[in-house]
């Protein structure tokens, strides 16, 4: 989700539509309006006019909704549908613009029979749960209407010139990376794309193939290009499109699924169509040879190195363990997000790394302050000790410690050069 906000802050249309839609989906539009001061009135006005006779029943917000404010809920649903349709349109334009992304299977609006209210996928016809598409021209389904274009231009402007948002995004670019090697551990969000046989999958970017660490590096370079490039607009545009690629493409190490079934989840009943097949990585991450291959690719010692993996929620309530491959890999899931707590059964993990070793702390969900006070409960956490060292780790054993030792060695060499007269003193 970070990369989506980063793309949105650069002014990328598809990323902006996704950000606004997800905020509407989880009843978080106040984050945009009150938190960042982003004006959503043009979108609200358009949604009220365009969908005034549409109940938009498929677009209820998830999570906590203030049912006492019915008018606000109705507006949220209309805004939600309006931005979702705009998203499918601008994403379709992007997919057509970038055939090298290999995402033609996500062009869905042209597969709809708007008279019958059905869609044909892989030769099979499915009925749509919502058949009202007043802004879609069947002859040119990916074209924005004049009103949608106005709303889109407005959103691009307010996202690009929101000072508070830009400050946060510059912080992410300054401090963040797609992966990080730290104190013998490799941290990444999603996966390292693999082939069916467990080897690194090659992904073509701008005519050249990349795999493993190189794929991470080129995608990060292009994402930064999409945000910071000011002179070469062609390069900037490609970098912006790459941020959306990172968000949703099956070859993205951050996403790691065959498709993002957003359209299917809204409009279709068939459960199989909603499934998002995971990358082969998830079939291999219990295999020590594959994990060692990944550790070596990123320059870590296979005997002591660890991988800290995010992205995939761990279904603790079903008995799933966050510790994989005999303790070489740990999955830290998104359980702090309420949306995932029904899946996981907990409120996420914290990985603690200190001089004593490694331990995982699993947290119970926090319901509300009222519940805590009324039931006199506390937030409990269960600790799992992963490995306990016999000798405590010292500062000199860490990455920072090694950097300090290198500085000390440099200073000693400098002192020696002065003492030998190799460097003359300035008087």
Predicted features along the sequence, with ranges:
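Feature recognizes metal-dependent phosphohydrolase scaffolds
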Residues: 1-427
